[in-house]
Amino acid sequence: MNATEMENVSIRRLDSSDPRFAQALREVLAFEAGEDEAIDRAVAQILADVKDRGDAAVLEYTQRFDRVEAASMGALEISQSELEAALEDLEPKRRAALEAAAARVRAYHEKQKIECGSHSWEYTEADGTMLGQKVTPLDRVGIYVPGGKAAYPSSVLMNAIPARVAGVKEIIMVVPTPGGVRNELVLAAAQIAGVDRVFTIGGAQAVGALAYGTATLPQVDKIVGPGNAYVAAAKRRVFGTVGIDMIAGPSEILVICDGTTDPDWVAMDLFSQAEHDELAQSILLCPDADYIAQVEASIQRQLDSMPRREVIAASISGRGALIKVRDMEEACEIANAIAPEHLEISAENPRQWSEKIRHAGAIFLGRYTSESLGDYCAGPNHVLPTSRTARFSSPLGVYDFQKRSSLIEVSEGGAQMLGQIAAELAYGEGLQAHARSAEYRFKRS
């Protein structure tokens, strides 16, 4: 065996007809993100320091963790001219791809804004009372973008563009630059997406600066974007002071296949999430045992050609599974129990089966719809709920950068009717001032 070759990777094989299947599936899905106490203590100290000392603390932590020394926070801000230069210097083909992806993401979220209740509304009752809802964008949003090897320009587009479409007045991006090395593609993406300010800071100190504000970096209303364990712990701690998008877990893909798709395609789709990190999860549900064997053979055959094969192998063997189901109906039932981040329905009639899906972050229909298209350029957002949170949460969208205020304008006639109802209920709750506040308006009319 060559030094570059790997032994066959071990993959769980489950069968839904096995009496122990439910327990085996729970074991596959088991993942406790947990909170590392050492990380949490360190993050708490960093956040308190940033809240207390502002810019000075951020500068110190940036020097300590990223090995970037700066005399002031201003020196860590990237100018608009530098962002423009990053875009201009891109290789034409790469720039065209980035701009095409941005255009599609923007078009999708513009449509989402129209269709998802993003406009104010009101109605008037017979007595002249007006009721409604006012929709307003957030004033200022912070976007966290990972730096170093995990720098993803696609994440810039997916986080910044819906904020811009929502009407957010100011978008501030933070991105660490370990050793002072900047990712020009990330900066170019910021320029395309319409980011207003970019600071080369990261970690818990960047989250603290966004959440509390400093003399240089103003406080934001919400922080979105992925990060490492320190960033996740910091976001969890500042929630309430500011809003956050979510605490994301490892990437997930679940493929439901009827056995009609090229097994090499399905194997590579499973790899597409497994290559993210060792804790990523890739699962296949299929009623055809022979087809499952073909996919497994393809996994073994293709693995050696993958640059990130060690990561893929660890992910597939540690958290992956190939599951034989009775039929496609049962596959959909199991998919709803798993509530995956990404769900591919690779079948002859994907729409038929998608009707049975209730819980998934994103649903990819048909054999030509690879999950990777959704990651980069299809248009819908790739920031999706993980760890079964798709049961109760949604992809990042325009709605995450808006808030809603109730509108109530009661007419004189309305005060007579509503006041009596409110007063009666208030007396029942023992709240005299509530009752009298309503009574004054109908007794004096």
Curated annotation (Swiss-Prot):
Cofactor, how bound (note): Binds 1 zinc ion per subunit.
Domain of life: Bacteria
MF GO annotations: histidinol dehydrogenase activity; NAD binding; zinc ion binding
One GO term describing the cellular component: cytosol
Binding, substrate: 251, 273, 276, 342, 375, 429, 434
Enzyme class: oxidoreductase
Key words of the record: Amino-acid biosynthesis, Histidine biosynthesis, Metal-binding, NAD, Oxidoreductase, Zinc
Gene3D superfamilies in alphabetical order: 1.20.5.1300, Nitrogenase molybdenum iron protein domain
Cofactor(s) the record lists: Zn(2+)
Reaction(s) catalysed by this chain's protein: L-histidinol + 2 NAD(+) + H2O = L-histidine + 2 NADH + 3 H(+)
UniProt binding sites for Zn(2+): 273, 276, 375, 434
Binding-site positions, NAD(+): 144, 205, 228
Reported function: Catalyzes the sequential NAD-dependent oxidations of L-histidinol to L-histidinaldehyde and then to L-histidine.
HAMAP family (UniProt xref): HisD
Family: Belongs to the histidinol dehydrogenase family.
Name of the protein in question: Histidinol dehydrogenase
Organism: Cupriavidus pinatubonensis (strain JMP 134 / LMG 1197)
Gene name as annotated: hisD
